[in-house]
Amino acid sequence: MKKIVVCLMALMALTGCNNGNGNENASSSPSFDEVLTSRRSVRSYDATKKISEAEVRTLLKATQEAPSWANQQPTKYYVAISPEKLAAVQDMVGGNKERIKDAPVLIVSTFERGKSGFFQGNQTNEVGDGWGAYDNGLSNCYLILQARAMGFDTLIMGMREADKLRELFAIPESETIMAVISLGYRAEEPNRPERKSLDDIVKFF
């Protein structure tokens, strides 16, 4: 519970940040609720709008505030921003290729195994490296929410050719490749998917 509270408090602070680059979407800082409700998994990007390396650095810096097991910080990011690397990664995301072909940035998200969920090299409970995946998810959550706060859009893709990505970015064997995240500006306004009712997911005792 403490980790969740810290996570939410940090995200509220992050979404009050403005990237200061003059983007029309960043003219005013959105509220935390606006960030949550406007975030969508975007599958069509505006090819005329680009994102700078400096903006990506600002975005990824926010992920460093994410909580992790014993502050292990197991998540790593590999950023494709050059035309050559973007084209290569597009061929490694299966059926999502056409959906993200106009995204100006593609980010590979990994985590170091044997960190979260371990103490002095020993697994602390039955979840094991599942804690690394959990912490990676928290970090990616910070990424996509900070992206929305900056006026950007994202899509987390689980379909990816891990072996090819590992070779392309020289990712160590000690890291598990979790996802590829596209980053850009939505080309059209996406629909809001139906959500379960609160009573379907919450039980009070």
Language-model features: where?
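Acidic, surface-exposed loops and disordered segments
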Residues: 17-205
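Positively charged n-region of N-terminal signal peptides that target proteins for export
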Residues: 1-4
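Hydrophobic alpha-helical targeting segments used for export or membrane insertion
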Residues: 8-11
